[in-house]
Amino acid sequence: MTTIRPCTHDDVDALVAINNSGYPAVPMATGEEILGLLSMCSLALIAENEDGTPLGFVMAMDPGLDYPSENYVFFESRFTNHLYIDRIVLTDESRGLGLGSTLYQQIFDRAKADGRERVTCEVNLEPPNPGSLRFHRRWGFEDVDTQPTKGGQVVVQLLQAPVS
């Protein structure tokens, strides 16, 4: 059985390991960077199996933060009432088992409870991440724009899904 719980500072090492295993789909991060992200998140969840082994996590942020992410800044310039998914990362072993959907259901439930109009995120087009794009399409995410980031090294598809 999988347990979903809020991330704590005690999870930082596991979050870094899972995060960095997802490169290049997500940017590499240090423990200090993950702690900084956690401090900005309105919702950060970690999934664990029966023996407490971390399987994945998701981090989401409310609008109005001083967060210099190019993608967050893009959404802030267009939407005022959104919940931004900064990242979702699953271990290789836990992909395809429905865990991403379990985490996203909690994101959408939170967005609805908080009166958000939409959930926003981005998916890499370059380097390509077709599995993530398919996943987001199944969740009703629609294209908003594309954007080169990191000096053109990464190109992302900026997405939004209405909260119903």
Outline where the language-model segments fall.
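Active-site rim helix/loop that mediates acceptor-substrate recognition in acyltransferases
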Residues: 24-50, 59, 65
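Conserved GNAT acetyl-CoA-binding A-motif
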Residues: 111-125
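A short, internal acetyl-CoA/4′-phosphopantetheine-binding micro-motif in the GNAT/acyltransferase core
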Residues: 86-95, 125
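Conserved acyl-donor/pantetheine-binding loop and adjacent beta-alpha core of acyl/acetyltransferases
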Residues: 59-87, 151
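Conserved active-site alpha-helix within GNAT-family acetyltransferase domains
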Residues: 101, 125-145
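A short beta-loop-alpha structural element at the N-terminal edge
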Residues: 2-15
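C-terminal "cap" of GNAT-fold acetyltransferases
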Residues: 77, 146-164
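Conserved acetyl-CoA-binding loop-helix of GNAT-fold acetyltransferases
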Residues: 90, 96-109, 138
